[in-house]
Amino acid sequence: FDAVINVESSHCYGNMAQFVKEVSRVLKPGGYFSWVDLRSKEMLAEMESAFNLVELNLIHNETITKEVIQALDDIHERKMTMIADNVPKAIQTAFRDFAGVKDSQIYNAFQEGKAVYLAKAFQKVTL
């Protein structure tokens, strides 16, 4: 592949290191891997070690937690309205948590610095 894009899903993978190895395997030399996701502070070291492959050269590394919080704030009311109007009351709390609205677990973790949102880009080394 010329490019692999992974957005907000790798935190659910059982083996991040294996995922990164597979990305490296399927990328053509010179290909790009773009990744954005969230991590708890406790998981950062494990995640960083998964990215430490000789074949992948880090070309962009940015913490975008502040921007994500701002985006969540900007769409808070719209999400709350959509949930109230379209989701059965019995499961609205779960939807609010999943949506990251204000006072949800993930929103509070970002605010308190217990979780971060990261953006990285890599290029596969050309041999």
Ranges and model annotations:
Residues 17-32:
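A short glycine-rich, Lys/Arg-flanked "PGG" loop and its adjoining helix->strand segment in the class I
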Residues 5:
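A conserved beta-strand element that flanks and buttresses the S-adenosyl-L-methionine
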Residues 9:
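Hydrophobic adenine-recognition pocket in adenosine-nucleotide-binding enzymes
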Residues 65-127:
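Conserved Class I S-adenosyl-L-methionine
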Residues 56-67:
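Conserved S-adenosyl-L-methionine
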Residues 32-54:
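Conserved class I S-adenosyl-L-methionine
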Residues 2:
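Conserved acidic residues
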